[in-house]
A protein has these predicted regions:
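Hydrophobic alpha-helical transmembrane segments
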Residues: 1-90, 260-268, 299-309, 330-345, ...
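Terminal transmembrane helical anchor/hairpin motif
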Residues: 39-62, 193-280, 295-315, 368-395
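Secretory targeting signals
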Residues: 59-60, 67-70, 115-175, 179, ...
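Central hydrophobic cores of alpha-helical transmembrane segments
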Residues: 180-191, 319, 342-354
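Function-determining sites in protein domains
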Residues: 343-350, 360-727
């Protein structure tokens, strides 16, 4: 019987009623491979890509798109194959029949696995071969494509088997369809929901919570379910560094295969019909579900009210969630509503664990917010200041040995990538600046802008934190960073691009105008870029104490690139004629070489050079501030307030007023991001001989320094409530 069960005749006979699975796989892989390939090729042709771009896109298709689409089809097919092959375990009559056959369960298990592999492999190989042939007909055939196709075959088979064995494990451990469906959903989504709950808890209870995913949280999310193991592998595969994820995928597959085989072979037939065939699993599942559910439902109630009753609602939600979820599980286990309150001792234990977890978060018993490493135990820090210094648009450039450049735009978001791709630094000034920021956050500082730090200790472990930073703290931090040579070299690495690729330089000056510089003088443009590079590297942190006096934008073209990831995280293919890169850099008064060249243009590099006729400041009143508000009732304006539709306007035209305002205003592009005033006010600067257009003259400026007292008084009289620097 053992040899007969693997015969082709028996395989054909036992596949009756399951032939729809390979038919489904054939159609699904037809859509995922050949049809998708033809659609994408049509779109590429519409966009008139060059041949080198098309080759890059076709190679990426096999490295990325086919991997994702094939994985989705493989997962769905694996689910259908597992359910179709082991569905009989939910029927006592069929269980008695199959398990009474003179065949070992292990042999029966392997027989069904072999059928499932055949259901998958035959359609897959046919459709993948068709996709290769389509590419070859379009001129894309190469040994590298064949290699990628073979690799995809192996990878998709691993993913297929992982989902297959995971589904079989669920079916083998459960005795009813309801419990099987719930357990399958839990196995594949539990870690995702748990990670979201942990992330939300950290955001609500910890002031220095880091929004990215790393360490234990990343492990829970990425390794806690078969689905996320596959997704994590796909995310890393296109980058080329997927060895670790591949080992995790294979290890998880072996674990699921072994567990499903053991669960099937040791399953007691008489337990069919029970919620869980292995009753020892009931308290384990109850703990894994009840405790997080109690905490999660408590968080929902915690977020509903806006007043001081949040804590009371939070406690109520945790109690309700713990009792409700535990009772529902007991009803499912026993299939009897009267068993809702079964296991009262267990419920009390779970409730105690929920209370301990909640108390730990609320009182920060683990010291999350107070964490700060000792200087001697610190290997270095990585800082993401994209939220503080957003005026400059920069990119990281790395020159390869063959003259090809690798381009990566500087992280503009506050995710983990902004802490992984930047240099590691260590200095006393930087350490003291971060220490001051941490102390202010410990005191409950809630206003300012958020920045992210990764501390790396000497043992190689990383700890990430997010801090709220005031304008003064940001100033100290940026000064410390500009003293770090490695940080500046990385931040302004685009200067490594060969001078021949610099095609245009544009400047923004103190009058707000945008001017093209040295349009017909390539040597002058190159000299300006070199002067700015030297000024940045040779000047330290004292440089950024002053406000910028200009911004220079460098446009490069014809760069030989291996393809790059843009600021939106999209892969951009390399092109034969080269890539384009645009950057913008602030120019400070300390940059003497750069200013010497810019003075030749005659454009204003100081507000003192502007002949201002008058300045109209528009104050936008708070809707909550009425005319009888006590805060404003005794405030008298220094100037005449002219009422507008949404506030007041004041025109300042006296010499002393204009001179005072010149010291604290700049075009919005020429302001350090960390010193912009968040005020409900805007201004229009009208130069001599220029007519006002009612706030739309194009010469918009913003506050960027010490605000004169007469402006503060008028703002208060105009009911301006938002009147702080970054705070």
């Amino acid at each position: 019987m053992k040899s007969k069960i693997y015969s082709s005749e028996y395989m054909k006979s036992s596949s009756k009623g399951q032939r729809w699975i390979p038919a489904f796989a054939m159609i699904a892989f037809l859509l995922a491979f050949p049809v998708a390939e033809l659609i994408l090729m049509g779109k590429w042709n519409e966009r008139s890509y060059t041949q080198s771009q098309l080759s890059y896109l076709y190679s990426s298709l096999w490295s990325s798109d086919f991997l994702t689409m094939g994985a989705a089809v493989a997962a769905v097919t694996a689910f259908f194959a597992a359910v179709s092959g082991f569905w009989y375990l939910y029927s006592p009559r069929k269980v008695d029949f199959y398990h009474s056959l003179p065949v070992k369960r292990s042999v029966l298990f392997l027989h069904r696995v072999l059928l499932a592999v055949l259901y998958y492999l035959v359609p897959y190989v046919i459709m993948e071969f068709a996709a290769v042939c389509i590419g070859a007909a379009r001129g894309y055939y190469s040994l590298s494509i064949m290699k990628k196709a073979l690799i995809l075959l192996v990878l998709h088979l691993l993913m297929y088997l992982l989902v297959y064995f995971s589904t079989v494990l669920v079916i083998a451990c459960t005795g009813t369809m309801l419990m099987g469906a719930l357990a399958w959903a839990g196995l594949f989504t539990y870690s995702i929901v748990l990670a979201v709950m942990l992330q939300l808890s950290g955001h609500l209870f910890f002031d220095t919570w880091y929004e990215g995913s790393y360490g234990i949280l990343a492990a829970v999310r990425n390794l806690g379910s078969p689905l996320m193991v596959i997704v994590s592998f796909i995310d890393r595969y296109s980058s080329g560094s997927f060895g670790k994820q591949l080992l995790i995928l294979i290890l998880t597959l072996f674990i699921m295969a072994a567990l499903s085989w053991m669960a099937f072979c040791r399953r007691r037939s008489e337990n069919t019909g029970k919620a869980l065939v292995y009753t020892w699993m009931e308290p384990v599942l109850s703990a894994l579900i009840t405790i997080p559910s109690g905490l999660g439902i408590g968080l929902i109630f915690y977020m509903i009210p806006e007043d001081s009753s949040k804590t009371a609602w939070w406690i109520f939600g945790m109690i309700l969630g713990t009792i409700l979820v535990h009772g529902i599980l007991e009803v499912i286990y026993e299939m009897d509503f009267r068993r809702f309150f079964r296991g009262k001792v267990q419920l009390m234990i779970f409730g105690g664990v929920v209370a301990i977890c909640a108390l730990t978060m609320k009182m920060d018993l683990l010291g999350y917010d107070s964490y700060f490493p000792a200087y001697d135990n610190l290997q270095g820090v990585v800082i993401n200041v994209s939220n503080l210094s957003y005026a400059e648009q920069l990119c990281n450039v790395e020159k390869k040995e063959d003259g090809i450049y690798k381009i990566r735009y500087t992280a503009t978001s506050d995710n983990s990538s902004g802490l992984l791709d930047q240099p590691v630094m260590k200095s006393k000034a930087l350490y003291n600046s971060l220490k001051d920021i941490r102390l202010q956050n410990e005191k409950g500082k809630k206003s300012g802008r958020r920045m992210y730090v990764r501390y790396i200790n000497k043992q190689g472990f990383s700890v990430c934190r997010g801090y709220i930073v005031s304008s003064a703290q940001a100033q100290n931090l940026m000064e410390a960073l500009y003293d770090e040579q490695t940080w500046k070299e990385d931040r302004y690495s685009f200067f490594q691009l060969d001078k021949q690729y610099l095609k245009e330089v544009t400047g923004i000056f103190c009058d707000g105008d945008i001017q093209t510089l040295f349009e017909k003088n390539a040597e002058k443009r190159q000299a300006l870029a070199e002067a700015l590079r030297k000024d940045i590297l040779e000047n330290g942190g004292q440089t950024v104490k002053d406000q910028p006096c200009a911004m220079l934008m460098f446009d490069y073209a014809g760069i030989p690139s291996e393809g790059y990831m843009d600021e939106w995280g999209m892969n951009v293919p390399a092109v034969q004629e080269g890539e384009r890169v645009s950057t913008s850099v602030l120019v400070y008064p300390a940059y003497k070489r750069t200013l010497a060249i810019l003075k030749e243009t005659g454009y204003p590099l100081s507000m003192d050079k502007l002949s201002v006729e008058y300045i109209d400041v528009y104050y936008f009143s708070s809707e909550a501030a009425g005319e009888d508000d006590e805060v404003f009732s005794d405030t008298e304006p220094i100037s005449d307030l002219e009422e507008t539709d949404n506030g007041y306007k004041v025109r300042y035209d006296k010499k002393e007023q204009l001179e005072a305002l010149k010291k604290c205003i700049r075009p919005s592009q020429l302001v350090n991001g960390w010193t912009i005033w968040n005020a409900d006010a805007t201004m229009e600067v009208v130069l001599e001989g220029q007519e006002s257009t009612g706030g739309d003259s194009g010469l918009y400026m913003t506050f960027a320094g010490e605000i004169p007292d007469f402006i503060k008084a008028d703002a208060k009289a105009a009911h301006v409530t938002e009147w702080e620097v970054n705070d």
